[in-house]
């Protein structure tokens, strides 16, 4: 933070006010109002037709799947779904918008008044972030600026033009860059879970605009700085950095000129990644500047209650519910549940299958976090390609819980199974490891206690740590014995004496 910003913070209490507009490309096979494919990566201007090029006389035909995916998203975001929505023309000129207007939604969006819960910084409590609306519109084309050649060429690719875009607008409820990232992470998780979008930011299927201003407490009076919209942020890291920079810039700006929201217009700024700062673009247009009016080529869309209910029934268990269930049903830590859920449905299924075989949620969670995910990262593979089936991992973990293998021997078996498609029994034989029989372990412990009466007396006197000396002896006599199992059995046997 700059010296001026630090000084301003010291003089006045400052609250950061953040609202996010998230633009999500929906995962449909064709565009919103024509039959052109939405596949990413095709040569420029090869996925176009008279409709998306805005040719005279070409009429749009609505994509029903885009409506269904929008309703599905709205329901998952706790939005109200109105019985009627309509299409409006948002009129502005830009080279990558060939019609001269964008088909969007103005006063009757397809989703309204929702909320999304996010975890706070402590990871234990939740905060509810309000949603103003989510409206469906067609995406614009893409301008590609070639400044490296020295001639500042700009080329237009209209392949993206007309792709279904759901704009999700939050209330200004976020209070820090970290909260903004947490909101975006939770939203992305939900969207990918629902399979409504792939949310690949590097491909432009998820883009973020951040609205930022400050509330400064001056002698008990709240002063609001002018709102700035930071456009087209293409990574969560850039969202954080842009917000943090903008907070500092607005503090310094207010210290210098005392401009407030009442005497300065809303402006848009871009983010310069290399310079790590925002830069001025233009004054922000108001809705009247776009001259919205109902699109005469498209009928309003009716959304019967039965239609909405059928989509609601197909939602299944959402990530927030799964996260809570994993904690209560399997007894795992909130952080572990969060990581597992964030990996997606396939990892959740793998974990729960392994727990079914192991009978120990906490121990299985530990193996997932430390061993399974580490291996996936090292090998750059998904859980579908993981070489150890979930049931087999669960069986291995159960052997630890039952005292038949200690952690070190179990990890030897785990590493072996990564490269050998064998059962647990075959793997232990291949490694020369023998699972310890319960009767054999009990005989060994009785033998040790008989040879060490002083340990028995010490434990009976309340010094349970005295059994530690016998655990080492047990490992020497039988290297396959689990220290945890030996310790517990020794204490149990002494209690019966």
UniProtKB/Swiss-Prot annotation:
It comes from the Bacteria. PROSITE patterns: GATB. Its EC number is 6.3.5.-. SMART domains: GatB_Yqey. The keyword Transmembrane does not apply. Signal peptide: none annotated. Disulfide bonds: none annotated. SUPFAM superfamilies: GatB/YqeY motif (SSF89095), Glutamine synthetase/guanido kinase (SSF55931). GO terms for molecular function: asparaginyl-tRNA synthase (glutamine-hydrolyzing) activity; ATP binding; glutaminyl-tRNA synthase (glutamine-hydrolyzing) activity. It catalyses: L-glutamyl-tRNA(Gln) + L-glutamine + ATP + H2O = L-glutaminyl-tRNA(Gln) + L-glutamate + ADP + phosphate + H(+); L-aspartyl-tRNA(Asn) + L-glutamine + ATP + H2O = L-asparaginyl-tRNA(Asn) + L-glutamate + ADP + phosphate + 2 H(+). One of its GO terms (biological process) is glutaminyl-tRNAGln biosynthesis via transamidation. Keywords: ATP-binding, Ligase, Nucleotide-binding, Protein biosynthesis. Heterotrimer of A, B and C subunits. Allows the formation of correctly charged Asn-tRNA(Asn) or Gln-tRNA(Gln) through the transamidation of misacylated Asp-tRNA(Asn) or Glu-tRNA(Gln) in organisms which lack either or both of asparaginyl-tRNA or glutaminyl-tRNA synthetases. The reaction takes place in the presence of glutamine and ATP through an activated phospho-Asp-tRNA(Asn) or phospho-Glu-tRNA(Gln). Belongs to the GatB/GatE family. GatB subfamily. This is Aspartyl/glutamyl-tRNA(Asn/Gln) amidotransferase subunit B. It comes from Rhodopirellula baltica (strain DSM 10527 / NCIMB 13988 / SH1).
């Amino acid at each position: 933070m700059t010296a001026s910003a630090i000084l301003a913070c010291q003089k006045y209490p400052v609250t950061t006010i953040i609202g996010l507009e998230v633009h999500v490309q929906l995962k449909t096979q064709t565009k919103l109002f024509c039959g052109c494919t939405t596949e990413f990566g095709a040569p420029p201007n090869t996925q176009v037709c008279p409709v998306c090029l805005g040719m005279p006389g070409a009429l749009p035909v609505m994509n029903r799947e885009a409506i269904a995916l929008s309703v599905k998203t709205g329901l998952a975001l706790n939005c109200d779904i109105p019985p009627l929505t309509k299409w409006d023309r948002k009129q502005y000129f830009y080279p990558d918008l060939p019609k001269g207007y964008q088909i969007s939604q103005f006063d009757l969006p397809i989703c309204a008044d929702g909320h999304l819960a996010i975890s706070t910084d402590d990871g234990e409590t939740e905060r509810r972030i309000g949603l103003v609306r989510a409206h469906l519109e067609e995406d614009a084309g893409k301008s590609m600026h070639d400044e490296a050649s020295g001639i500042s060429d700009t080329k237009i690719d209209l392949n993206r033009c007309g792709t279904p875009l759901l704009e999700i607008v939050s209330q200004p409820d976020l209070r820090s860059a970290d909260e903004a990232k947490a909101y975006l992470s939770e939203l992305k998780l939900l969207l990918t879970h629902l399979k409504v979008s792939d949310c690949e930011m590097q491909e432009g299927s998820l883009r973020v605009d951040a609205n930022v201003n400050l509330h400064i407490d001056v002698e008990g009076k709240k002063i609001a700085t002018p709102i700035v919209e930071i456009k087209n942020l293409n990574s969560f890291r850039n969202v954080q950095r842009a917000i943090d920079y903008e907070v500092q810039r607005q503090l310094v700006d207010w210290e210098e000129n005392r401009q407030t929201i009442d005497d300065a217009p809303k402006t848009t700024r871009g983010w310069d990644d290399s310079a790590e700062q925002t830069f001025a673009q233009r004054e922000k247009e108001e809705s009247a500047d776009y001259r919205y009016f109902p699109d005469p080529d498209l009928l309003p869309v009716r959304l019967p209650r039965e239609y909405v209910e059928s989509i609601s029934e197909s939602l299944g268990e959402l990530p927030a519910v799964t996260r809570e269930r994993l904690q209560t049903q399997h007894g795992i830590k909130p952080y572990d549940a969060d990581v597992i859920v964030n990996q997606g449905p396939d990892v959740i299924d793998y974990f729960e299958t392994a727990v079914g075989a192991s009978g120990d949620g906490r121990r299985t969670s530990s193996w997932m976090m430390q061993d399974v995910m580490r291996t996936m990262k090292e090998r750059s593979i998904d859980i579908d390609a993981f070489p150890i089936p979930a049931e087999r991992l669960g069986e291995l973990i159960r052997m630890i819980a039952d005292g038949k293998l200690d952690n070190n021997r179990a990890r030897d078996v785990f590493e072996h199974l990564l490269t050998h498609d064998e059962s647990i029994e075959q793997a232990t034989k291949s490694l020369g490891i023998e699972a310890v029989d319960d009767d054999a372990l009990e005989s060994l412990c009785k033998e040790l206690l008989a040879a060490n009466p002083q340990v028995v007396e010490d434990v009976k006197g309340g010094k349970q740590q005295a059994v530690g000396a016998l655990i080492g002896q047990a490992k020497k006599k039988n290297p396959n014995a689990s220290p945890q199992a030996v310790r517990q059995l020794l204490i149990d046997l002494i209690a019966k004496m």
